[in-house]
A protein has these predicted regions:
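UBC/E2-like fold recognition across ubiquitin and ubiquitin-like conjugation systems
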Residues: 1-63, 73-183
Length: 183
């Protein structure tokens, strides 16, 4: 019942954010998987821009793939979250494991875990924890990057505008004769 409720909340979250949270795959029966193997995986695609390397903001990763592993004692035991696409972040280990912090409560649903992951990958300063660093190189880079380009963070407010070709408009496009009767 709890896992079904979590999946419903993930679907509601996805709808509320314009399908920027996609449930890519899960096993057919999460409860059976946990009972038989001791864990189950929920795979997500988060369509929020993030930092794939030190080359940000020149290079932006638009989608982040995440695997959330639920152990047999879930929800009493915190889920384990791992990013499987490149990310350069102070609170994400080089292996991709996310440092979610120590705030886990069994009453917390997976939707709240996903919201926290979104805050992490978008460099939301309300959740960025430089006191408990998983990647010191990323922290040093981030400190310099935010000084150089403070508007590039959080990454979800920084959108890359693709150059577009201008549509030529001239007065010759307007009809030269307009009658007094409007036609």
């Amino acid at each position: 019942a709890r896992l079904d409720e979590d999946l419903r909340k993930i679907e509601a979250l996805s709808k509320s954010v314009g399908r920027r949270v996609l449930l890519k795959s899960k096993t057919d029966n999460l409860v059976d998987d946990i009972m038989l193997t001791g864990s189950c995986n929920v795979r997500l695609a988060l369509k929020y821009p993030t930092v794939p390397s030190r080359q940000y903001p020149k290079k932006v990763q638009k989608t982040t793939d995440v695997v959330v592993k639920l152990l047999s004692r879930y929800p009493l035991v915190e889920p384990i979250a791992e990013i499987t696409t490149p990310i350069f972040h102070p609170n994400v280990y080089a292996s991709g494991k996310i440092c979610l912090g120590t705030k886990w409560l069994p009453s917390e649903g997976l939707d709240l875990v996903i919201k926290r992951i979104i805050q992490i990958i978008t460099f939301d300063d309300t959740i960025l924890n430089d006191a408990s660093v998983a990647n010191r190189h990323a922290l040093n880079w981030y400190r310099g990057a935010i000084k150089r380009d403070p508007l590039a963070f959080p990454t979800d407010v920084f959108e890359i505008i693709e150059p577009q070709s201008a549509i030529p408009v001239s007065w010759s496009d307007v009809p030269s004769e307009v009658s007094a009767t409007g036609g």
